[in-house]
Amino acid sequence: MQDHTTEGGFLSSKSSRNTVTNINIFDPANGASTLLFKAPKKEGIPIVIFETGFKNGEIEFNATHSNLVMNNSRISKREPKNKLLIGIRSADSKETTLFVSDKRGAGLKKLVSVPATADWHIDVKNSKLRVVHQTGKGVRIESYEW
């Protein structure tokens, strides 16, 4: 779902800026359509990541997220995970809040809020989402199941 800043239609717009504010999940098997979030996310949803397949020893993803996906070589063959990773970035604080759900939108939960001073990535080989914080001269790493 998009928040249009100028005239336009539901699926298209003449707007100079479109912001994705919710995600519609359509199940072609039964024709059901549901929104991922109960209320639109005014901040916008710039990050939607999910696994799509396996090829040449790597897990494939829905889009190019090379800076967010690491340790993705020599992976044992497996089916794609039934997970969505959604990121919402605050325009004010630049903090990114990460949510996970299954690919049908069920089980949506907030995973972590990542401050602008930290980095995060998916570690494919170890099935982890890692948040890396700089602490003085060292680092602090948080790991979450992916």
Model-inferred region functions:
Residues 1-146:
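Sequence signature of WD/YWTD-type beta-propeller architectures
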